[in-house]
Amino acid sequence: MQSTAVGQGSIDPIQTVDLIADKQLTEKQEYCHNLITFKESSNNRHAVNGSHYGYYQGRSKALKGAPDDYQFYWYWSYVSHRYGVTRYDEPNYCKALHHLQVKGWQ
Protein backbone atom coordinates (compact mmCIF):
# COMPACT_ATOMS: atom_id res chain seq x y z
CA MET A 1 0.00 0.00 0.00
CA GLN A 2 1.30 3.44 -0.90
CA SER A 3 2.07 5.69 2.04
CA THR A 4 2.28 9.43 2.50
CA ALA A 5 4.93 11.12 4.62
CA VAL A 6 3.48 12.99 7.57
CA GLY A 7 5.74 14.27 10.30
CA GLN A 8 8.60 11.84 10.87
CA GLY A 9 6.79 8.64 9.94
CA SER A 10 4.65 7.57 7.05
CA ILE A 11 1.01 6.56 7.10
CA ASP A 12 -1.57 5.10 4.76
CA PRO A 13 -3.32 7.66 2.54
CA ILE A 14 -6.76 7.31 4.17
CA GLN A 15 -5.14 8.00 7.52
CA THR A 16 -3.98 11.32 6.08
CA VAL A 17 -7.59 12.30 5.36
CA ASP A 18 -8.65 10.99 8.77
CA LEU A 19 -5.95 13.06 10.48
CA ILE A 20 -6.96 16.21 8.64
CA ALA A 21 -10.62 15.61 9.50
CA ASP A 22 -9.73 14.92 13.13
CA LYS A 23 -7.88 18.23 13.42
CA GLN A 24 -10.31 20.36 11.39
CA LEU A 25 -13.78 19.07 12.35
CA THR A 26 -15.89 18.62 15.45
CA GLU A 27 -16.57 15.02 16.42
CA LYS A 28 -20.12 15.08 14.98
CA GLN A 29 -19.04 16.47 11.60
CA GLU A 30 -16.05 14.13 11.47
CA TYR A 31 -18.39 11.16 11.99
CA CYS A 32 -20.64 12.27 9.10
CA HIS A 33 -17.60 13.03 6.91
CA ASN A 34 -16.22 9.54 7.52
CA LEU A 35 -19.55 7.88 6.66
CA ILE A 36 -19.69 9.80 3.38
CA THR A 37 -16.09 8.95 2.50
CA PHE A 38 -16.60 5.24 3.15
CA LYS A 39 -19.87 5.08 1.20
CA GLU A 40 -18.64 7.11 -1.75
CA SER A 41 -15.32 5.36 -2.33
CA SER A 42 -14.71 2.71 0.36
CA ASN A 43 -11.91 5.07 1.44
CA ASN A 44 -10.15 4.66 -1.92
CA ARG A 45 -8.53 7.88 -3.09
CA HIS A 46 -8.19 6.46 -6.61
CA ALA A 47 -11.85 5.43 -6.91
CA VAL A 48 -13.46 6.16 -10.27
CA ASN A 49 -17.14 5.86 -11.15
CA GLY A 50 -17.80 7.23 -14.61
CA SER A 51 -16.80 10.89 -14.46
CA HIS A 52 -16.54 10.95 -10.64
CA TYR A 53 -13.19 10.65 -8.88
CA GLY A 54 -11.48 10.20 -5.55
CA TYR A 55 -12.58 9.78 -1.95
CA TYR A 56 -15.69 11.89 -2.42
CA GLN A 57 -16.56 10.94 -6.01
CA GLY A 58 -16.49 14.55 -7.11
CA ARG A 59 -17.21 15.44 -10.70
CA SER A 60 -13.93 17.23 -11.33
CA LYS A 61 -11.04 15.87 -13.37
CA ALA A 62 -8.74 17.75 -10.99
CA LEU A 63 -9.55 15.07 -8.39
CA LYS A 64 -8.27 12.21 -10.53
CA GLY A 65 -5.06 11.16 -8.79
CA ALA A 66 -5.05 14.30 -6.63
CA PRO A 67 -3.26 14.24 -3.25
CA ASP A 68 -5.33 13.50 -0.16
CA ASP A 69 -5.22 17.02 1.25
CA TYR A 70 -6.33 18.51 -2.09
CA GLN A 71 -9.31 16.15 -2.20
CA PHE A 72 -10.21 16.94 1.41
CA TYR A 73 -10.19 20.70 0.91
CA TRP A 74 -11.97 20.43 -2.46
CA TYR A 75 -14.82 18.62 -0.69
CA TRP A 76 -14.64 21.06 2.23
CA SER A 77 -15.35 23.88 -0.25
CA TYR A 78 -18.05 21.92 -2.07
CA VAL A 79 -19.96 21.01 1.11
CA SER A 80 -19.58 24.52 2.56
CA HIS A 81 -21.10 26.08 -0.55
CA ARG A 82 -23.84 23.51 -1.09
CA TYR A 83 -24.91 22.66 2.47
CA GLY A 84 -23.60 25.59 4.50
CA VAL A 85 -21.35 25.69 7.54
CA THR A 86 -21.95 24.97 11.20
CA ARG A 87 -21.65 27.51 13.99
CA TYR A 88 -18.02 26.37 14.27
CA ASP A 89 -17.36 27.49 10.68
CA GLU A 90 -16.88 23.97 9.38
CA PRO A 91 -18.69 22.33 6.45
CA ASN A 92 -22.01 20.77 7.42
CA TYR A 93 -21.18 17.18 6.49
CA CYS A 94 -24.16 15.90 8.48
CA LYS A 95 -26.52 17.95 6.32
CA ALA A 96 -24.77 16.55 3.24
CA LEU A 97 -25.10 13.02 4.63
CA HIS A 98 -28.81 13.59 5.32
CA HIS A 99 -29.28 14.73 1.70
CA LEU A 100 -27.54 11.59 0.42
CA GLN A 101 -29.73 9.40 2.65
CA VAL A 102 -32.98 11.13 1.59
CA LYS A 103 -32.03 10.62 -2.06
CA GLY A 104 -31.29 6.95 -1.35
CA TRP A 105 -27.63 7.34 -2.22
CA GLN A 106 -26.38 6.23 1.21
Model feature map: region roles:
Residues G9-Q106:
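Peptidoglycan cell-wall recognition and remodeling modules
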Residues M1-I11:
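N-terminal prepro-regions of secreted/extracellular proteins
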